C-alpha cells in the first residue's frame, strides 16, 4: 500500500522547492509528480506532423517520494502510517491521528 496517492495534498520538505505545496498528479515506484513543483524548461523543436510550434515550455518533473510529506489539517507536514481497521488497511496521519480516505 502506497503512503502517498494521486490527489493527495503534499508539501516539499527538501530541495529547491522546499515549503511549496501542491496536489499529486502521478505516483511511480519511487517518484511523485506534483502540480506546479519542480518545473524545468524544455526546448521543443517544431513538428508540423503533430502541429506543435517550437520554443521553450515549462514541464513538471517527478520528485523522489522521500522529499515530500502529506499536509495535515493544520497545514503542517505529517508522516503517514498504516493500520488495520475493520479488517482493512487504512492510512492515517501520525501528527493528528486522522484517518485518510481511501
Swiss-Prot record:
Top-level taxonomic group: Bacteria
- Annotated signal sequence is none
Known CDD domains for this protein? KOW_RPL26
| Keyword Coiled coil in record | no
Q: Which UniProt keywords apply?
A: Ribonucleoprotein, Ribosomal protein, RNA-binding, rRNA-binding
| Molecular function via GO | rRNA binding; structural constituent of ribosome
Tell me a GO biological process for this protein: translation
Q: Which InterPro entries does the record associate with it?
A: KOW, Rib_uL2_dom2, Ribosomal_uL24, Ribosomal_uL24_CS, Ribosomal_uL24_KOW, Translation_prot_SH3-like_sf
Q: Which GO terms describe its cellular component?
A: ribonucleoprotein complex; ribosome
Query: PANTHER family of this UniProt entry?
Result: MITOCHONDRIAL RIBOSOMAL PROTEIN L24
What is its quaternary makeup?
Answer: Part of the 50S ribosomal subunit.
Q: Which HAMAP family match?
A: Ribosomal_uL24_B (MF_01326_B)
Similarity remark: Belongs to the universal ribosomal protein uL24 family.
Q: Name the job this protein performs.
A: One of two assembly initiator proteins, it binds directly to the 5'-end of the 23S rRNA, where it nucleates assembly of the 50S subunit. One of the proteins that surrounds the polypeptide exit tunnel on the outside of the subunit.
Name under which the protein is recorded:
Large ribosomal subunit protein uL24
